[in-house]
Regions:
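Short S/T/G/P-rich N-terminal loop/turn motif that feeds into the first structured element of a domain
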Residues: 1-52, 59-70, 79-122
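A short hydrophobic/aromatic micro-motif that marks alpha-helical segments and, especially, helix-coil
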Residues: 74-76
Length: 122
């Protein structure tokens, strides 16, 4: 399983939702035009837009690193708009593992799966 998945949980600071939306629209444009290995990049809101989930899928560790390099300049401004926690899912390469300091994001490695790579029996 080479794919890397990310799940970010976002709780907006008071009055910062519109700024976060503006910044994530910039991020989405970068993903669309510069990222080569991003397979999925979706944002979901709860009913009152006080929280969001960002779901990301990358072809492999190199694609995830490319994405982080492309949007890195947006991370500090985004962190000023919300409390963000997250999970990284997959078996990332050593470069990504070295960058995982502290407790965020939390890394979860594969155990068992039903996916396109390992479909159910017919």
């Amino acid at each position: 399983m080479k794919e890397i998945k990310g799940l970010a949980r976002v709780k907006f600071l008071p009055g910062k939702l519109e700024e976060w939306k503006r910044l994530t629209e910039q991020a989405m444009e970068i993903v669309r035009t510069k990222d080569k290995g991003t397979l999925q990049y979706e944002i979901f809101f709860n009913a009152d837009e006080s929280e969001a989930i960002v779901f990301e899928r990358y072809r492999d560790s190199d694609a995830a690193l490319e994405h982080f390099a492309n949007i890195g300049h947006l991370m500090a401004p985004l962190m000023e708009t919300a409390t963000i926690t997250g999970e990284l899912l997959g078996d990332p390469n050593e470069q990504i593992r070295r960058n995982l300091t502290g407790d965020q994001p939390k890394l979860f490695t594969p155990w068992i799966a039903l996916s396109d790579e390992q479909p159910a029996a017919k």
